[in-house]
């Protein structure tokens, strides 16, 4: 009998991280690898943010904070939501976390009992199902289709809800698809939540990276909602680990208790840097967003030219989710072939659910020169295979 718990054994690995590890092995062996597999901004964190962190450390902000987070940061977040979304968020309903992933644990830990279900897209970010499974819940996937912009059909979401359903998980802009849910989509999902009594769990980590319209938060449409967000993507702060959960009032104290026991609090000086990010770094966010958009406009047609199918162009985030079945049905095997034979690292679509099989995710968190080199290598590989 294995000494490892069944709970740990059941957690699915991030397959893309295995691709990352192999890419690094090849680089250490002297290979030049075009890295298009990971969602990590290639920009440095804006200097105004790093200076704020340095100043906070020099001022002694190296100790514990309240588990809910620094009041200054929570108040800055309420101001941001008021100015950017015209939504009033009570600072008391915000829990600051060490990245958005811990916020997900707080959310599902406060919401789910064993056997409870969460409706989510297929394909979607794989951690959602892993968190739900780990806590004894049941993911309930609903297929979304490239031909429909990877957006939910409301009637299929409604049909997936039963007496054990606690939440509908959404992610807009989305990973891996770059899909953005419009006002009509969000209104329809909010109406389902109000009708059925479930909550919406909205992962909004890619807000600030929408190329076709304004950011929309689910809080504009219903208060039966949890919001997951953070600083990693738009502010180029993945390594800083700073996120937050906005929760309905009844769930704040339960989430706080989980935070106290699992994480205690986010780093003090990083929270101070977060305040400055919200107040002073928006021009940097817009500069990076504009550059990502240029890359998006290059990469989509370039991938089409070498034989990949893109029915739904990304409207947000920094990913292109391309149908690669012309090159092979098995996306994992194809990703490894492209890495070993072409020197290009990609994320296999199967990592994001059965609905992603046959697809590859390309990150454009790399400069245009590297994107062009990756496309050149892939085109050569496709022509010679």
PLM region spans:
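Short, contiguous pre-domain boundary segments
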Residues: 1-7
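A glycine-/small-polar-enriched, mobile loop at the entrance of the PLP active site in fold-type I
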Residues: 37-41, 55-74, 83-84
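PLP-dependent class I/II
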Residues: 4, 14, 19-33, 40-56, ...
């Amino acid at each position: 009998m294995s000494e490892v718990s069944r709970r740990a054994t059941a957690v699915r690995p991030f397959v893309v991280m295995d691709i990352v590890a192999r890419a690094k092995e090849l680089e250490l062996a002297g290979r030049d690898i075009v890295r298009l597999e990971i969602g990590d901004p290639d920009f440095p964190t804006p200097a105004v943010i790093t200076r704020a962190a340095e100043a906070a450390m020099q001022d002694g902000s190296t100790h514990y904070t309240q588990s809910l987070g620094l009041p200054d940061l929570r108040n800055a977040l309420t101001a941001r939501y008021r100015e950017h979304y015209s939504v009033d968020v009570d600072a008391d309903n915000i829990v600051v976390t060490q990245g958005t992933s811990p916020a997900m644990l707080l959310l599902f830990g406060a919401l789910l009992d064993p056997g409870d279900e969460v409706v989510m897209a297929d394909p979607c970010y794989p951690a959602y199902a892993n968190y739900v499974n780990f806590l004894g819940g049941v993911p309930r996937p609903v297929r979304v289709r490239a031909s429909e912009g990877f957006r939910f059909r409301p009637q299929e979401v409604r049909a997936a809800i039963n007496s054990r359903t606690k939440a509908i998980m959404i992610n807009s802009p989305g990973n891996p698809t770059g899909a953005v849910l419009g006002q009509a989509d969000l209104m329809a999902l909010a109406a389902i939540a109000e009708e059925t009594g479930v909550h919406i769990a909205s992962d909004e980590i890619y807000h600030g990276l929408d190329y076709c319209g304004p950011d929309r938060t689910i809080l504009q449409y219903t208060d039966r909602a949890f919001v997951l967000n953070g600083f990693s993507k738009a502010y180029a702060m993945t390594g800083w680990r700073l996120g937050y959960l906005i929760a309905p009032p009844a769930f704040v104290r339960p989430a706080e208790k989980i935070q106290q026991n699992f994480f205690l609090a986010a780093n003090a000086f990083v929270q101070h840097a977060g305040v400055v990010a919200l107040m002073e770094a928006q021009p940097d966010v817009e500069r990076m967003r504009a550059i990502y958009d240029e890359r998006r406009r290059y990469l989509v047609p370039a991938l089409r030219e070498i034989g990949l199918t893109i029915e739904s162009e990304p409207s947000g985030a920094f990913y292109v989710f391309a149908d690669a079945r012309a090159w092979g049905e098995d996306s994992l095997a194809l990703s490894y072939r492209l890495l070993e034979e072409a020197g290009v690292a990609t994320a296999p679509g199967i990592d994001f659910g059965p609905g992603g099989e046959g697809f590859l995710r390309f990150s454009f968190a790399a400069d245009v020169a590297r994107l062009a080199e990756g496309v050149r290598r892939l085109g050569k590989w496709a022509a010679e295979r």
